[in-house]
């Protein structure tokens, strides 16, 4: 070993690092390695003599630490630069050209996902606060230390994926536990990515559709991009589908149906726009747009050398066309509320239903007990034992008109946009133009008072004191009489889709009739008091298997004229509440004929409400809570509302049987109920109608 090499080793000092408290000293300068690793950095053919020293330095005197620093810097620069140039990824920064032609970027490698492309240099955006802090800490170090650290960063930055792994493995192998803990804490934040922004929008929407409303609202607060995705109609339309007019299977939360008035107004707006649309009266710019484009294109073909003036003219014309198109977008575009706002509105109403937050309006005007009512939008119709029908404005509480013509008390009524039909104890039904108060026609067919009626499409059914159900067909003017009950028929319900009718009677039974065969296809037994109401539930209503109670101890069902049989003996009954084929109702129901409503609810003077499955005749649930007979009943997919002799109104969950809320206020028995998505109305023998609105 010559003197020069010996003095160089002495300048470095020992190559062995010391350990303090199990950790390498953080104050040790970061210089180039000693003699043991000298050749690995410089290459096998390089020596110290090949490197020039600073002017004025001599090889004869000993090499101190300060005289060796310029040598190390030159050595580092001489060896780092080729490494950097050799390992720069071509797709990130191609080096020069080949044969005078630019270097072509290779096609994307489909074997790797977007996060693992070893052929590309990482373009991850730098974290500004972190880099500022790093820069300040670096500036506190000596210049030589800064250069050494910068060289290490440069080598790692230019290294390919395989080299980077080796470098990291070597570094972590020399780290102590505190340093490894620091790496773990730092990496935990660095590996977090904005996956919603990185993924295609379709996949992002799919992910967001699995979140609940609270999580979606929090996601919208992350960034502008997340807000745009989380507030998109794709996500909230799915949320509305899951919750509006039905109970969500995941969270058990259900929201009221959209306002029918709003739907009808939207439909009328579309029809009005379609009816008044005239092609000859298009907004300015629509008709001439294509002609302008065609002329500009033709001019450019005829005079390709016309110069900048023609080009500017074409640009001005195109700009004018675009601006005109933007101005005319509103002419064609229909304005819709964002689905998030729709959900927000319905959620507010649903919350008010849950906690009983509502406003109350009382309608007074009848001189005797109110026996029937119905409301739609801002119109309320009530029928009373004073033989009159009153039409009210629900928004102002004003009485609009009174319909007079019946000779006795009015027990039932129903109206739509064009007509109102009423049934009275004077044995007649009357058809009214409720907007003018004119009586259009009177139907006489029962030998007793008419206590129940319902029409759907062109079919009208009426129940009477004479123990019969009469069917009136408005289309072919035909009628038929259904006999089978042994006491008053208090309520009837028509389902025109399946061509069936339900009837409830004082003989404690409920019957299902086939209008094609004019026969009874099912009789439901279970109530021990006179059945006052029967209400089919909407087809959207779903009842879970695990919610079924054992209610068959005192329940039987008769199919047709056969003797009473247990539900398990019925055709098509498999012991489950899954969809039952139409054949369960008899041979008349083939695959092309819709089945009757799957579930019905009934109320009786035995103080109970029952939920039935029509295909099997099973009583799925009995609702207990009223102290006296239940006269009035209304239901939808979310709730059941009942009114009873005990002067109370109760709100029930049809799936659990739980009474969610009780309303009081009437001083007489509650005889009739009307139910909407955001309100309900009750009528009583105290001559009052009380309307509860939850849209506050």
Curated annotation (Swiss-Prot):
Residues 193-239 form the F-box domain. The keyword rRNA processing does not apply. InterPro entries: F-box-like_dom_sf (IPR036047), F-box_dom (IPR001810), G-protein_beta_WD-40_rep (IPR020472), SCF_subunit_WD-repeat (IPR051075), WD40/YVTN_repeat-like_dom_sf (IPR015943), WD40_repeat_CS (IPR019775), WD40_repeat_dom_sf (IPR036322), WD40_rpt (IPR001680). GO terms for molecular function: ubiquitin binding. The keyword Transcription applies. Belongs to the WD repeat MET30/SCONB/SCON-2 family. This is Probable E3 ubiquitin ligase complex SCF subunit sconB. It comes from Aspergillus fumigatus (strain ATCC MYA-4609 / CBS 101355 / FGSC A1100 / Af293). The lineage of its organism: Eukaryota, Fungi, Dikarya, Ascomycota, Pezizomycotina.
């Amino acid at each position: 070993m010559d003197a020069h090499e010996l003095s160089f080793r002495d300048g470095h000092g020992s190559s062995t690092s010391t350990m303090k408290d199990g950790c390498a000293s953080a104050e040790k300068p970061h210089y180039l390695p000693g003699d043991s690793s000298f050749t690995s950095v410089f290459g096998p053919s390089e020596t110290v003599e090949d490197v020039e020293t600073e002017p004025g330095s001599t090889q004869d005197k000993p090499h101190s630490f300060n005289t060796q620093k310029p040598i190390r810097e030159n050595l580092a620069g001489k060896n780092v630069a080729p490494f950097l140039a050799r390992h720069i990824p071509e797709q990130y920064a191609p080096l020069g050209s080949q044969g005078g032609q630019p270097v072509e970027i290779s096609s994307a490698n489909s074997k790797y996902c977007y996060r693992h492309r070893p052929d590309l240099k990482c373009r991850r955006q730098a974290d500004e606060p972190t880099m500022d802090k790093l820069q300040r800490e670096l500036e506190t170090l000596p210049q030589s230390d800064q250069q050494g650290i910068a060289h290490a960063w440069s080598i790692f930055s230019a290294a390919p994926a395989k080299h980077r792994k080796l470098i990291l493995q070597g570094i972590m192998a020399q780290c102590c536990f505190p340093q490894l803990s620091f790496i773990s804490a730092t990496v935990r934040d660095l590996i977090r990515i904005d996956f919603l922004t990185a993924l295609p929008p379709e996949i992002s929407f799919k992910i967001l559709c699995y979140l609940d409303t609270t999580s979606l609202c929090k996601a919208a607060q992350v960034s502008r991009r997340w807000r745009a995705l989380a507030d998109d109609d794709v996500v909230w339309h799915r949320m509305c589908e899951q919750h509006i007019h039905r109970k969500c299977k995941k969270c058990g939360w259900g929201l009221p149906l959209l306002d029918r008035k709003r739907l009808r107004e939207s439909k009328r707006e579309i029809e009005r726009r379609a009816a008044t649309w005239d092609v000859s009266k298009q907004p300015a710019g629509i008709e001439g747009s294509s002609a302008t484009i065609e002329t500009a294109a033709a001019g450019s073909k005829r005079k390709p050398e016309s110069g900048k003036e023609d080009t500017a003219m074409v640009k001005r014309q195109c700009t004018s066309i675009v601006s005109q198109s933007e101005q005319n977008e509103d002419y064609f575009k229909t304005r819709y509320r964002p689905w998030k706002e729709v959900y927000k509105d319905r959620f507010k109403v649903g919350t008010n239903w849950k906690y009983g937050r509502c406003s109350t309006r009382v309608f007074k005007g009848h001189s005797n007990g109110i026996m029937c009512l119905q409301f739609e939008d801002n119109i309320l119709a009530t029928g009373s034992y004073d033989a009159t029908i009153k039409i009210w404005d629900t928004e102002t509480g004003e009485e609009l008109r009174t319909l007079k013509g019946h000779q006795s008390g009015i027990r039932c009524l129903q109206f739509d946009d064009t007509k109102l039909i009423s049934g009275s104890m004077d044995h007649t039904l009357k058809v009214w133009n409720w907007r003018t108060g004119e009586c259009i026609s009177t139907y006489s067919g029962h030998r007793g008072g008419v206590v129940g009626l319902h029409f759907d499409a062109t079919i009208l059914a009426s129940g009477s004191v004479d123990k019969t159900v009469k069917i009136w067909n408005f289309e072919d003017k035909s009628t038929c009489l259904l006999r089978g009950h042994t006491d008053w028929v208090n309520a009837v319900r028509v389902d025109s889709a399946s061509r069936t009718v339900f009837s409830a009677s004082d003989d404690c039974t409920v019957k299902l009739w086939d209008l094609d065969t004019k026969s009874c296809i099912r009789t439901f037994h279970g109530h021990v008091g006179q059945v006052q109401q029967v209400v089919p539930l909407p087809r959207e209503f779903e009842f879970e298997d695990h919610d079924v109670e054992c209610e068959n101890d005192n329940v039987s069902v008769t199919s047709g004229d056969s003797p009473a049989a247990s539900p398990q003996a019925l055709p098509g009954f498999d012991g489950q509440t899954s969809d039952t084929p139409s054949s369960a109702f008899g041979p008349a129901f083939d695959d092309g004929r819709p089945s009757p409503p799957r579930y019905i609810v009934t109320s009786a003077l035995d103080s109970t409400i029952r939920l039935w499955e029509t295909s099997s005749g099973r009583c799925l649930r009995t609702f207990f809570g009223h102290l006296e007979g239940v006269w009035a009943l209304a239901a939808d997919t979310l709730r059941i509302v009942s009114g009873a002799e005990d002067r109370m109104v109760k709100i029930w969950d049809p799936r659990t049987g739980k009474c969610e809320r009780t309303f009081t206020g009437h001083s007489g028995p509650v005889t009739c109920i009307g139910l909407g998505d955001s309100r309900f109305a009750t009528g009583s023998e105290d001559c009052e109608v009380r309307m509860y609105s939850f849209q506050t």
